[in-house]
Structure formats: structure tokens, C-alpha cells
Regions:
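Short S/T/G/P-rich N-terminal loop/turn motif that feeds into the first structured element of a domain
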Residues: 1-61, 68-81, 88-109
């Protein structure tokens, strides 16, 4: 398997939230529904390499994205569809978020 090539300075951004596992169906549906407006908005941002979102029955939801640089990743902290619309939808179904972190990439396979 070939090792992927990433630009120097690439980072991945992790946004994670927790919720009552009894609300899994609601949170999972909300995650899918918010994709209808998050995907087109995020695709417009410079520096996006990849984006993944998922929800676990164990009471956790996560968004992991890969960016060319820390500055590119920081666009997410200003994206209305994320910080207003999706956050409101998430909180409405009981999701509480932990601080978002951008991680410089140490190694890849």
C-alpha cells in the first residue's frame, strides 16, 4: 500500500460531543440531517483534504477533518452553518461538546 502524501503543515481537526446513549437515534438522525447543509458549505472552504462525521451508540459523536494547514482548519470556527446551525441542532438533541482541537500530523500510513 502506498503512503499518502500530505502537505507540510497539514493538520486534522477533531470535534467531539457526548450525549445520553438513550438518545442515539435522535443524534444519529441529526448528524445525517445536518450533512445536507454542512457538506456544501464545508466543500467551499480552502484547504480541505477530507471530512468524516459519525455517531456511536455509546453516546459520542465526532467530526474529523483533514486540512492543508492550521489556518485552513480554523475556517471551521467561523463557518455559520457549523457554529450556529449545526451546533443548535446538536444541542437540541442533548449533545454537549468538548473543546475542538487541531492536531499537527506526526506520522501517517
Amino acid at each position: 500500500m502506498a503512503t499518502p502524501s500530505l502537505p507540510a503543515g497539514a493538520v486534522f481537526r477533531v470535534s467531539r460531543g457526548n450525549f445520553d446513549p438513550a438518545r442515539f437515534a435522535e443524534v444519529d438522525q441529526m448528524t445525517r440531517d445536518t450533512g445536507s447543509y454542512l457538506i456544501p458549505a464545508i466543500r467551499q472552504l480552502d484547504g480541505l483534504i477530507g471530512y468524516y462525521a459519525g455517531t456511536s451508540e455509546e453516546g459520542s459523536t465526532v467530526h474529523v477533518s483533514l486540512w492543508r494547514s492550521h489556518e485552513d482548519a480554523q475556517q471551521m470556527s467561523r463557518l455559520k452553518e457549523m457554529i450556529v446551525d449545526a451546533r443548535g441542532a446538536s444541542e437540541a438533541v442533548g449533545v454537549s461538546f468538548i473543546p475542538i482541537v487541531n492536531y499537527p500530523i506526526a506520522w501517517i500510513i
